[in-house]
């Protein structure tokens, strides 16, 4: 029995399913999850010392790579002064100013502790500000696990084959309208049915929780226009895409301006952080300046703030945004080329530092329905063959992959060599 298997067995005795987030259990791909002991740069190391090229990056935050010296130095220096104060700090102002500088649609920002907390708070703010109850989201998009948003959700919920979760009251779910991602007509229909009831539209600008699905041309702009027409707020959930698709987020890449933005992952540099922000007029509706309540014991934690500041300052350096996109493109096109050589139907979507692979005979994957029609079994075989060779992909056919600035051309080349062998295995009788 491997060390990971022993640890997993032990974990299952005291942690539900042996993990603290469902997708980590490998239920989507089968087998035993790999237990990681340390990480550095583009690599993670399991408890037996095996090294993997990491394309999960802690599910997105590690955009600079693991254990980056600037972040580590900032965290250690800040920790010497204390771990948490429960008071305002200079560091939270500095990170807020940095976020407002990099994302022009954000005039004010409130720090929280997770992406789920950010989206939950933004939804409450939108409802309070508009004095409306209904919200509109998209099938296959995931915005955290708050009750209002865990309706036909993607991510781990999609992986486990549960379109919604038990424990979400119907009274909550009835206020959530679910439309088709990349189908603007479905949104128009919803607004026509509930013209004065929709508080907000919330969307992942790149749907990273049904793998990696890009918005069709004018989809995001169309949502903006509909929100303007019907008096609803437009929320772009950049927890995953923020500072990763582009330095100003996916909203800058696709040239669309939301009323509110939610952030997480990258802004913590690996520490637990979330944030939501937007127009000053709307944000001032939050307590203590407004009637909508939101609070948090560890919000604005100084160590997390220092990590976020260090991370964003590194990302601002000239050439980093372009290099991240270049590495992602090299990997994506390389995988597609190898699949073609092996006559394996494959669609590879990518943008900025995100990518997704779909085993499918379809020419493109632009919707939830197309995503769930892909060959999950073939992905699972590919995943394990890559894992054997020291390449760690997301353990689910419905999760995006993440590039980091620590990855090198040599890492991409090694990954493609492993993929060549994995594709060949898929063609062999033992994997057919």
Swiss-Prot record:
Subcellular location: Cytoplasm
Pathway in which the depicted protein is active: Porphyrin-containing compound metabolism; protoporphyrin-IX biosynthesis; 5-aminolevulinate from L-glutamyl-tRNA(Glu): step 2/2
Pfam families: Aminotran_3
Main location: cytoplasm
Keywords attached to this entry: Cytoplasm, Isomerase, Porphyrin biosynthesis, Pyridoxal phosphate
Enzyme class: isomerase
Needed cofactors: pyridoxal 5'-phosphate
Substrates-to-products reaction catalysed: (S)-4-amino-5-oxopentanoate = 5-aminolevulinate
Lineage top rank: taxon: Bacteria
InterPro entries: 4pyrrol_synth_GluAld_NH2Trfase (IPR004639), Aminotrans_3 (IPR005814), Aminotrans_3_PPA_site (IPR049704), PyrdxlP-dep_Trfase (IPR015424), PyrdxlP-dep_Trfase_major (IPR015421), PyrdxlP-dep_Trfase_small (IPR015422)
An example Gene Ontology molecular-function term: glutamate-1-semialdehyde 2,1-aminomutase activity
Keyword Endoplasmic reticulum in annotation: no
Family matches, as CDD domains: OAT_like
Record-level GO BP terms: protoporphyrinogen IX biosynthetic process
Modified residues (N6-(pyridoxal phosphate)lysine): 265
Catalytic activity, EC: 5.4.3.8
GO cellular component: cytoplasm
Family stated for the protein in its record: Belongs to the class-III pyridoxal-phosphate-dependent aminotransferase family. HemL subfamily.
UniProt-recorded name of the protein: Glutamate-1-semialdehyde 2,1-aminomutase
Gene: hemL
